[in-house]
Swiss-Prot record:
Organism listed in the record: Arabidopsis thaliana (Mouse-ear cress)
Keyword field: Glycoprotein, Glycosidase, Hydrolase, Plant defense, Secreted, Signal
Listed name of the protein: Probable glucan endo-1,3-beta-glucosidase BG5
Gene: BG5
Signal peptide: 1-30
Top EC class of this enzyme: hydrolase
Chief site of localization: secreted
Length: 354
């Protein structure tokens, strides 16, 4: 997860103009203190590996089991992680295709078959692989056009094998040229060129698009103009009125702006999975504290668990993944290193989630 300033500007401008050695008991204790035990079934966790002090994958999987996490997302087919997941079919795994592999894979179906045989096939009998994501926020961009052919090849492959694996991609909100009010949501011209064909393929296969939604970045761009309670699900009052639809939190507004943009391109009722959301606990002064991060993530969990959906899609449950399991010290210095729920050294929670 890395946001480039130029792309941040394009999205946030439209947003802010208007919005005034461990044993099992150790793991269980950690689980109870972070609070996921009672609400995890709707929530997944991103499992990043950009750190030199991370616990072993086997310890991480034990942690996930102890806190009832049943969905995880990994960014590439890491063999150590996948081997640790063997036998844990109660955990649905989303596996990413690395961005740097897209060029070679987009060249031919044979290349995709080779990738699948190496990275997925050896684990099919032992691991519940639910999703393969092709690229991580590369649409729109120079390698964006490589996503669709790889998705098509993987879709053909899993269909021919009758495998229950969904093929999708992960996109960020800079695909939106306009996002406020939500009903004005529309894609950029480059997104229409690169993303819309992907969305239409997903409609045909009834597979969701995975989207990153980070109210934190909108808030951080202008904290004096955007209400913190609106950004953190911490008010029930309507802050943004969009025709007949009222919004009490920024997450729903961003989500629905993307829904509106899809509908304007003739893509209706396509499911959306939140591939990432979260709030850093440090790295940007007093707007990134454990208290604020805990508030956002607690309220996000409650929002997802409620099943109430968004104003545009009421009573339609949302699947979501929190970012991230651990603070990762090899990510860029600042907030990027501080999105984790746990410290990697002692595996203790950074804040209580409930």
């Amino acid at each position: 997860m890395l946001y480039l300033p130029k792309k941040l500007f394009l999205f946030f401008f439209s947003c802010i103009v208007v919005i005034v050695n461990y044993n099992n008991s150790d793991f269980v204790n950690a689980a109870n203190s972070i609070g996921f035990v009672n609400a995890a079934n709707s929530i997944g966790l991103n499992y990043g590996l950009l750190g030199d002090n991370l616990p072993s994958p086997s310890k991480v999987i034990t942690l996930y089991k102890s806190i009832d996490i049943t969905k995880i997302r990994i960014f590439d087919p890491n063999t150590e992680v996948l081997n640790a997941l063997r036998g844990h079919r109660d955990i649905a795994v989303t596996v990413g295709v690395r961005d740097q592999d897209l060029a070679a894979l987009s060249a031919s179906e044979e290349a995709v078959k080779g990738w699948f045989a190496t990275n997925i096939e050896p684990y099919l009998s032992d691991i519940n692989i639910a999703f393969i994501t092709v690229g991580n926020e590369v649409i729109p961009g120079p390698i964006g056009p490589q996503v669709l052919p790889v998705m098509q090849s993987l879709t053909n492959l899993v269909k021919s094998r009758n495998l229950p694996i969904s093929i999708s991609t992960v996109v960020a909100m800079w695909n939106l040229e306009q996002s406020y009010p939500p009903s004005a949501g529309m894609f950029t011209s480059q997104a229409r060129e690169q993303l819309v064909p992907v969305l239409k393929l997903l409609s045909q296969t009834n597979s969701p698009i995975l989207v990153k939604i980070y109210p934190y970045f909108s808030y951080a761009s202008d904290p004096s103009s955007i209400r913190l309670d609106y950004a953190t699900f911490n008010t029930e009052a309507i802050v943004v009125q969009d025709g007949s639809l009222g919004y009490s939190n920024m997450f729903d507004a961003i989500f629905d702006a993307f829904v509106w943009a899809m509908e304007k391109e003739g893509v209706k009722d396509l499911p959306m999975v939140v591939s990432e959301t979260g709030w850093p606990s440090a790295g940007n002064g007093n707007i990134t504290t454990p208290d604020i991060a805990g508030t956002y993530n607690r309220n996000f969990v409650k929002h997802i668990a409620s099943g109430k959906g968004t104003p545009k899609r009421p009573n339609k449950g949302i699947d979501g993944f929190l970012f991230a399991t651990f603070n990762e010290n090899q990510k860029p210095v600042g907030t990027e290193q501080n999105f984790g729920l746990y410290n990697p050294n002692d595996m203790k929670p950074i804040y209580n989630l409930f």
